Amino acid sequence: MSRSRHVGKIRKRLEDVKNQWTRPARADFSDNESARLATDALLDGGPEAYWRALSQEGEVDFLSSAEAQYIQAQAKEPPDAPDSAGGAESGPRGLDSCSLQSGTYFPVASEGSEPALLHTWTLAEKPYLKEKSSATIYFQMDKHNNIRDLVRRCISRASQVLAILMDVFTDVEILCDILEAANKRGVFVCVLLDQGGVKLFQEMCDKVQISDIHLKNISIRSVEGEVYCAKSGRKFAGQIQEKFIISDWRFVLSGSYSFSWLCGHVHRNILSKFTGQAVELFDEEFRRLYASSKPLMGLKSPRLVAPFQPNKGPEAPNGRLSGTSDSASDRTSSNPFSSLSTGSNAHNQSLSTSSGPSSPLAPIPPTVPRLQPYHSTRRAVAPQPLLVPMRPHEGAPAPYSSLMAYRPTRLQLQQLGLVPRVTHPWRPFLQALPHF
């Protein structure tokens, strides 16, 4: 009987705020039961049931028109019919599985290959653990550091892995940058795309005629936000509005920027660059979302052992990443990738040329000692692991690491028995050499 005279939590607070003589109450962050009942009514019965629940609970209309339309459009029926075996026990069990995302995805995913694959990321040695924490902010007004150019530069300079979480992906040029990094440089790319943006992404791929055959080293997966479940079992999923890029586990680009033409040219956005311990938080969030994602295009179950394998030797990560935390001026400069700026000296330019697709923040590698003449060719040229780029500081062979390089060509051929030792003294250079 007293249910109709009940005053909702939001309505009561509005009345207190409007009355200037009322003392401010303590902030209450508990759940609003009236709002939950009204949302369940909207999910089960539509707008009329929603208004009826608001009237019974004495609550104000707390949903915007866009939110109400989204809930009705994304509503899904429960996977199991309520008439199935189990009776009343099926209701609470279905509610628990829907409301607790960790209880839904992780126990199921831990039995497959993907969670074990993600678990190797934790065991791998991360370069960001040796970096000093820093943060740099970029705005759209900075014409010298266009946000779109910074994102594309990050993709073009990746050398091992790119982990991308995005809500909208319709920029064809950024797609070309990702395809070039994966197909030309062997960079493993994993893109987690919001379920709401899947249709637009597939539309872009159809326009430019991109299919699975072009995504040999790319894994594109769809992911949803949190799941809201009513007591009846009907549910709807939220959106992924997080956007960030993890490049080689060294730094993260995060902000409001989406992979679209409007965001690159018209919309105003903000972009933040994080290094150091903050990268680990983004890595953990990416792995959690990866565990609940579904394959969309490209690799269905990628084997990340080769791309994610840490560098051989304990000194390789230090030598490659110490330049990012040497000075504060490098972290707070106008250009986050100082080696790509036009004012770089000749030494930095030669470094970026020799290191290929290595990081733009990589320091000058130490000089590789030349091997002694008694080292053999087989010992100097060691087999490299698959998909790991060669770098001067990772044990690459020196240019002159063999005894054969210090001897004339004719003496080398004589040792192999390919050239007769007796030649005419007056015609030493006319002797025909055998062709291999």
UniProtKB/Swiss-Prot annotation:
Keywords: Cytoplasm, Mitochondrion, Phosphoprotein, Proto-oncogene. InterPro entries: FAM83, SACK1. Transmembrane segments: none annotated. Pfam families: SACK1 (PF07894). Residues 1-298 are annotated as: DUF1669. Residues 73-95, 302-371 are annotated as: Disordered. Residues 321-349 have a biased composition (Polar residues). The modification Phosphoserine is found at residues 301, 329, 350, 359. It is found in: Cytoplasm; Mitochondrion. The keyword Phosphoprotein applies. One of its GO terms (cellular component) is cytoplasm. The keyword Oxidoreductase does not apply. Widely expressed, with relatively higher expression levels in adipose tissues, especially in epididymal and inguinal white adipose tissue (at protein level). GO terms for biological process: cell population proliferation; epidermal growth factor receptor signaling pathway; positive regulation of adipose tissue development; white fat cell differentiation. Residues 350-359 have a biased composition (Low complexity). May be phosphorylated upon EGFR activation. GO terms for molecular function: identical protein binding; phosphatidylinositol 3-kinase regulatory subunit binding; protein kinase binding. Directly interacts (via DUF1669) with casein kinase isoforms CSNK1A1, CSNK1A1L, CSNK1D and CSNK1E. All members of the FAM83 family of proteins share a conserved N-terminal DUF1669 (domain of unknown function 1669) domain of about 300 amino acids. This domain mediates the interaction with casein kinase 1 (CK1) isoforms. Therefore, it has been proposed to rename DUF1669 the polypeptide anchor of CK1 domain. Belongs to the FAM83 family. Involved in mitochondrial maintenance during adipogenesis. May be acting by playing a role in the maintenance of normal mitochondrial function. This is Protein FAM83A. It comes from Mus musculus. The gene is Fam83a.
